[in-house]
Amino acid sequence: DALFQVIWGYNIVTVLAGVFVWFAIPDTHPSEANGKEHTPDGSISKHIVAVLRIPAVWMQAVILLCAYVAYKGFDNYSLFAVDAYGMNEVDAAAIVTIGAWLRPVAALGAGLLGDRYNVSRMLALSFLFLLASDLFFAFTTPIAGAVGILLGNILIGSTAIFAMRGLYFALLEEAKVPVVMTGTAVGLVSVVGYTPDIFVALVAGIMIDANPGATGHQHFFVFLSTFAAIGLVVSLTLMRLLHRNKAAQH
């Protein structure tokens, strides 16, 4: 019965979101004028080629990939709390739920800060905090019952993860991707960026099965740390690229 309520809750929220988008977001599709339908300059294939030639789009794809690896890794926190910190399943789920409630706060806060200090800089900062959080879990010895340490680090990691989810598509505007190519760019970025859906859970399962207990989880956090480091480097590189492009325009 509880699962039934959850499913209906997701369905209702999704439908309401669709209705909101339909009425709240203006229709920017080319409309008919003078009896003729206007279409964007160039064919779809030309848009694809043009988008593929924009370095910032590829960097954004890598950033999304690294951020989404972290998001999929969030699913491992509760099992880590049980296997490494000796918590029971109920308490572990409660701690992870606290981290999950940071989603709206972190995403909204990061978006506001991104508008003020630029998105790429906030992404780099988020990856930095995420890297520190992952490295802590990867290389420190878990202490059974140390709930405060566990919760504190989960909150740091969760804040970084959900902050990035409120930022990465805003890079399109910061990178000055032409509006007419936005859909194509989002498609390319998504194809690359959401591939962690395919492999992260598999990697986690292999590592934890090969090394049961805390060791397997620590290996998985090394895996997560690697992607956090890549995301940090690419974010900093993109920030420098955009700064250089902006300076060249003045």
Question: Which sequence ranges carry the predicted segments?
Answer:
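Juxtamembrane intracellular "pre-TM" segments in multi-pass secondary transporters
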Residues: 27-60
